[in-house]
């Protein structure tokens, strides 16, 4: 999967041994860092000292944190630590590696002359020691200073780091005049921060000299003999912590006004680029790359954007909170509430606030929502070299996917495209020119969506004809595609887009595109929108030779008339509705996913060539879950220019309607199709119901209630058992061999109870019913089913009981015991549970009906028009009238307030609004995907759906739900096995299910083996 890391001993650039000491003191140094840019600065500083300093020589061994996963490298690291004088570490936030580092260094801490650790996990920070200064008791100190710092952190939250930077900058000036050793050691620790954050070769060189002068015993002894300092040390060279930068500028700038004033004096660019109306792209950069001189990839990005005619405003920040830079520099200096950038690209590769440490996504979202611009996150390779990435079928290292792809997605980040690689020997970054070009082109395309008038924008809607079952064209999971497209087209027309000749109905539109509503995939009856000659196709498809190698010469036999490539679809003014071709391997669809030689066919490629280069779309809308473009061969994440999804989509902004309950495959569209997801709600769940034979059985059981005590009780019991055998339900319910006349009333009740319970289980299975239409308000019964399902879950994280539990409590029963007795087939309890469920649905229905309009639908307007006017809530009346008058109102009130909140989220029509915002080049709010029943926070739909926070699963709710499931499973297994618990249990783990349930399956496994997940020191 990934190229193995070479042994550290072979990496000569980071293992530097001075050739000749010539009487100099030797200091042995070991460092571990996250950021490879420090590798080149450290190596240059050590080489400079070894060459120029007559009193000190340094032997250094350097490590990038991910290299310590290799057992061989870790053993070499421990050997180096055992011989070291000084240990330095920075940004060690990967929990398992932080533990390994702490375990390796801690036994040698007292012997080491100094340990200097910059922001990292607490167990690594505790290694800090410089003379009398120590962090050994970090987090445990009761000193006034420690308590002050804790309170400061709690109060300021994510801005704590910025406060700390101010302390680092000012405290050394104060401590300088305090004579005590402890004060001087504390001052040296603060100075170390300044040297390190300065990052230049000069600063790192003086940092190492300062450590040797003050903490290396042999240097200190020689200094005493000389009566003065042995080494000449300069104070840290300080740089702006936050500001603006340009590779051609003479300096860094503190304000946007100052930067623009310089920008407008340039003679190397045309006057058009100085015009405030020119497309403007904002770049976010890490200051460490600038001060260490490791900025080749930043220079390349600025140059590429400017070559495309864009103004570039590139800003940097020294901390981990880039929201301040966004708010400070991306607005007009003369009009502070007006953003001057049209799109933003982060080149840091990390979350906007918090970087690789603890993120603050709400703060990031607040800043980005205010800016309201598309936000792309490009990826510098941090955890792997260029060669490792190029050779990997997976693409990005899993840790890099988590930190640099998954976490920025929670901020609303788009287009995770690799920006730069790094040299395995020097650690220096280098731009990947074709990737830089792709990022720049996409940034400008997003910017142009903001700038172009609506009536001039050309849009493409792509519908699917998805094999292998050759289903009807225009299908998508849970979505009425043509009705939804018609609604979207009407909304676009009403908002000023040039949509002409739109059919009156969705059926008419479908007929125009298909000609025959029953047309199957590959049917010649599809409407031909364009015939593309082979010469035109080849001229506009740079990678056509790769397709010819697999499929032969164009045009091929798919989507072709033998001479031309055929583009199916229909044009409505500036809207093109096109049919995505099949992927070509209908007989063996898995070949496309697993064969390295597979590729899209000429017809498939021609469709996207048409959208990009001939139709000239400003954006494409993939309509529904899901198409096949994002599943084309290539790396899984962090694609190269040779990966087909990257080549197919090109620079087109890709907006994708996706079912909210499928974030796992939606994530594939985001990462491989560069999609901005607009989620749509799935149809309301309905009970599966019973087949005709099972319904007849249910009616017999209903009759049993009235006949059980009379003479016909035996007869109807026998009839029910015969019916159970007839419908093959006896395979699920164990029936006695004897006649009912030989059974007691209790035994008959138990048999009928077990059958009744099995029927309830079958009938109450929840299935989505119908198809969703984008922009159409839901029906009362649909909303009732959704809210009833939501109300059926305990939510301990919100201190909220389920509705069934509240109703059980009101009659003195425990819901868990009721489930158990119902599972055992105790007839009275099976009947009670059925009644509770029915009344719960009726109570929730009363809430929904009170907020419905005259058409039996629930809209934003009808919800707002509901007033109680001091009346008893209708759901309370349902409880009072149906045998549950004693429900605890303190429990019911928060639950129904929550259900009202969920109702508002369900009817919030943001699916059309979200699409129109995306087409305007606005920022689309991120939102988790998943099951709306388990997690109503995925609502309202119409947001940029992401998967999950890898640092947050399993959630506490998932752990609680998992425990309930495991307890019930084990109890049922015990009952079915004569009181014996199972010895082994097999569990199938699906990524999709874990994303939907926020890690419930993982939590089940943990529960079964008897462990409970605990957060790390950062709460992850």
Identify the meaning behind each predicted range.
Residues 2-77, 82-1020:
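Ligand/cofactor-recognition surfaces for anionic moieties
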